[in-house]
Amino acid sequence: MLSEDLATSFLPPSYMWSLTLFALCLSAILMFPFLTGRRLSITHRKQGWRISLVNTRGDFQNEAEQLIRMGFSKSPSAFRMSTDGGPRLILSQKHLDAMSDDDHFNVAEAVKRDYLLDLFGFETAFHGTLHSEIVAPAVTAMTKKLVPLVPLMSKEAALGLEKEWTDNSEYHDVPLQPTLGGVVARLASLAFVGPDLCRNPTWLEITVSYTINRVIAVYVLRIFPSFLQPFVHWVLPPCRKLRAQIQQARELILPALKHERQLQSAGNAKRDPNRPFSSLAWNDEYAAGRLYDPTVAQLRMIFVSIHTTIDMAVKVLVRLCEHPELIQPLREEIVTVCGENGLTHSSLERLLLMDSLMKETQRLEPASLATIARYTHRKTTLSDGTIVPKGTQVVLPNMFMWNNESIYPDSNTFDAYRFLRMRDDPETAKLASFTRSSHIHTAFGHGKHTCPGRFFASDTIKIILCHILLKYDLQLCDGEAPAKKRYGFAMYRDPDARIRVRRRGVEGVSEGILAGF
């Protein structure tokens, strides 16, 4: 009795209610195998019945690649396994074309189910669906504006690196992911929300952290059965943090949008062509008076673009630190290509060794083991007779990119020149570009649902690499490369990793190029 009095006197009612709800949810989880009569452990080692759901998810989170290999060793075409998002049908690479059939395999529904879009604060379409549909055309429009955007992005990269890495000519440690994240956020924000907001510290923090916070919230919610998720998300701290951050973003976006609208007032039907492109203004013009949520539209663009670009930039920088012999050839390429006209969209396209380095890094370290996910709206029979029931969530892993000698000789070996050599072969030249998706490289997806932002991501990373390579020397800390990490399907480098950098002296043609950066 005394302990109960102490608990109720020191804990607020809302906290006690949360604890009670948590206890009920935990009970539901432990009882879930009894209630459903379904075991989710399919390819996993056998687990005890009491926590089979939690254990199988734990196996997936820690050993996803090994489990997929195990599954394909038993069933080379397709098999079922459990993930932290529920059961999935895993298909082999030979079914890639079949998954491009929208009549049978739906992308939007897979995304909706994976990222819980029906929950308030998880990009819910409560004001209509325009802000969700607008992302792809907005990114396409932004891609068409890369020619005038690149010089502006280059100036932003210079400012960002000076802030994050300083001009210190002595070697000093820098945290890799946060500093590159800050630079990527500035470049992306310039194109997303325009020059007036792209240096706002609060907005930049949202830009970098929103996706991470959202992923954390989804992972926490996945602990609970789906029928409880619409209730528990209201009280779970990661979900509450996400909703608070969306409101914080709204307080920045709406005044910026009001300013954009004022620029178009006084009878101006079209936007000033001399004002830099921003998806914020473009979205509003595209909406043409239709109801939409401009904040959610921007956060959707952030969610699908920023974190993957930061992840890719980090991995490329790590590879350069691991292979310092690549740095001088890359510097020479930049000087040769950019020597006449400076850093432009056209010159970025001609940085072929850099392009090959990026594509090879992505081949071995994509953002995910499985970038292609679909949901079936009807029963489907594949070419080899495999039956995919209606309502199945389907995944196609990328592992063939580093585990198939018939596609890539020495497939487990990093070779920065691999795709540069492919350009010399007429049969493979068209597959060599970093932005090209194909049957042998699916890191950006495949078919008409290939990532539309890959061109912008490519230019962003190349701009940053040009500035880094010409302005800084790089070293690993204590000779140790940042560790490769896995969590479920996610593949990333240690987010706490640091490297050593110093500002280098530049002379001759390099100095001339930098003057135009």
From Swiss-Prot:
Glycans are attached at N404. It is found in: Membrane. The chain crosses the membrane at residues 15-35. Its main location: membrane. Keywords: Glycoprotein, Heme, Iron, Membrane, Metal-binding, Monooxygenase, Oxidoreductase, Transmembrane, Transmembrane helix. Its EC number is 1.-.-.-. GO terms for molecular function: heme binding; iron ion binding; monooxygenase activity; oxidoreductase activity, acting on paired donors, with incorporation or reduction of molecular oxygen. It holds the Pfam family p450. This is Cytochrome P450 monooxygenase cdmJ. GO terms for cellular component: membrane. Cytochrome P450 monooxygenase; part of the gene cluster that mediates the biosynthesis of chrodrimanin B, a meroterpenoid that acts as a potent blocker of insect GABA-gated chloride channels. The first step of the pathway is the biosynthesis of 6-hydroxymellein by the polyketide synthase cdmE. The prenyltransferase cdmH acts as a 6-hydroxymellein 5-farnesyltransferase and produces the hydrophobic metabolite verruculide C. The FAD-dependent monooxygenase cdmI further converts verruculide C into verruculide B. Its cofactor is heme. Compounds in the chrodrimanin family such as chrodrimanin A or verruculide A exhibit strong inhibitory activities against protein tyrosine phosphatase 1B (PTP1B) and therefore, they could potentially be developed into drugs for the treatment of type 2 diabetes or obesity. Furthermore, chrodrimanin B, the end product of the pathway involving chrodrimanin A or verruculide A, does not exhibit the PTP1B inhibitory activity, while it functions as a potent blocker of insect GABA-gated chloride channels. It is a single-pass membrane protein. InterPro entries: Cyt_P450, Cyt_P450_CS, Cyt_P450_E_grp-IV, Cyt_P450_sf. Heme binds at C451. Pathway: Secondary metabolite biosynthesis; terpenoid biosynthesis. GO terms for biological process: secondary metabolic process; terpenoid biosynthetic process.
